[in-house]
Amino acid sequence: MAGTGVVAVYGEGAMTETKQKSPFSVKVGLAQMLRGGVIMDVVNAEQARIAEEAGACAVMALERVPADIRAQGGVARMSDPEMIKEIKNAVTIPVMAKARIGHFVEAQILEAIGVDYVDESEVLTLADEDNHINKHNFKIPFVCGCRNLGEALRRIREGAAMIRTKGEAGTGNVVEAVRHVRSVNGAIRLLRSMDDDEVFTYAKKIAAPYDLVVQTKELGRLPVVQFAAGGVATPADAALMMQLGCDGVFVGSGVFKSGDPVKRAKAIVQAVTNYRDAAVLAEVSCGLGEAMVGLNLDDKVERFASRSE
């Protein structure tokens, strides 16, 4: 059922399928390889090397981190392919890059230059207000954001191999990321208590594909990896998201907008690895220097997360 976007089922930490793997299942498997890791935003090769040395499982190559996108305004587009290629040449870990929502040509360019994953991102300016990219048309895995279970399953049906919370990138404020992961996981807990008749009604209520709703109920989790993103700025933030049930963490402005990026990058990786060990978390949280300047999410702050559904 690969053509419909049904995902292979989780086994003991690995993909399991009774039939031959579909192209989509392969992409889901590639995304699963990043479980338990930290993905860091970088704007040049030097930052990419710092991230790799700190233990990041992948880097996100972009010209401006979300905090700068917020501060500078204007239209935020796909990064210069030359810059992305320089970052790819500087590290051995996977490299991601962002495309605007609905801008399938930006995604085609990113695939052509050899990025490992594409993030169809609400942090960039929308290219299409009504349609997301048909991600089944691509060979590489896509990452998409969500605020709730309905959004997550719609993105998976379109071909997303990884889901992340939208949060509010560039704010250094984790409250929206927490809200989004609690929304998704709370809905899944509710779903597991439903009978078959109720599942039909619930799928319609959240505007999600029925077969993916059923699969999520059976698994007790999303059928693809779920990372936290948007506002993660400290080791404690990262560990919080892991304890809430995420499979890994994206860190954007929180590292390279801080007082000591090298030390903070290593600390966040350690926090994700040891997210249930309070003694380790206390140790890695010491002496990190000044954290990035955060934003209170009031009416004056643009909500990137609301740009798409």
Swiss-Prot record:
Location of the protein in the cell: Cytoplasm
A GO BP entry: pyridoxal phosphate biosynthetic process
Domain of life, per lineage: Eukaryota
Binding locations of D-ribose 5-phosphate: 41, 170, 231, 252-253
Pfam family, one: SOR_SNZ
EC number from the UniProt entry: 4.3.3.6
Catalytic center residues: 98
Keyword list, A-Z: Acetylation, Cytoplasm, Lyase, Pyridoxal phosphate, Schiff base
Pathway(s): Cofactor biosynthesis; pyridoxal 5'-phosphate biosynthesis
UniProt main location, coarse: cytoplasm
MF terms (GO), sorted A to Z: protein heterodimerization activity; pyridoxal 5'-phosphate synthase (glutamine hydrolysing) activity
Catalytic activity: aldehydo-D-ribose 5-phosphate + D-glyceraldehyde 3-phosphate + L-glutamine = pyridoxal 5'-phosphate + L-glutamate + phosphate + 3 H2O + H(+)
Reported function: Catalyzes the formation of pyridoxal 5'-phosphate from ribose 5-phosphate (RBP), glyceraldehyde 3-phosphate (G3P) and ammonia. The ammonia is provided by PDX2. Can also use ribulose 5-phosphate and dihydroxyacetone phosphate as substrates, resulting from enzyme-catalyzed isomerization of RBP and G3P, respectively. Also plays an indirect role in resistance to singlet oxygen-generating photosensitizers.
Subunit structure: Homodimer or heterodimer with PDX1.2 or PDX1.3. Interacts with PDX2.
Misc note: Vitamin B6 is an essential quencher of singlet oxygen in plants, that can protect cellular membranes from lipid peroxidation.
Family: Belongs to the PdxS/SNZ family.
Protein name: Pyridoxal 5'-phosphate synthase subunit PDX1.1
Native organism: Arabidopsis thaliana (Mouse-ear cress)
Lineage: Eukaryota, Viridiplantae, Streptophyta, Embryophyta, Tracheophyta
Gene that this sequence comes from: PDX11
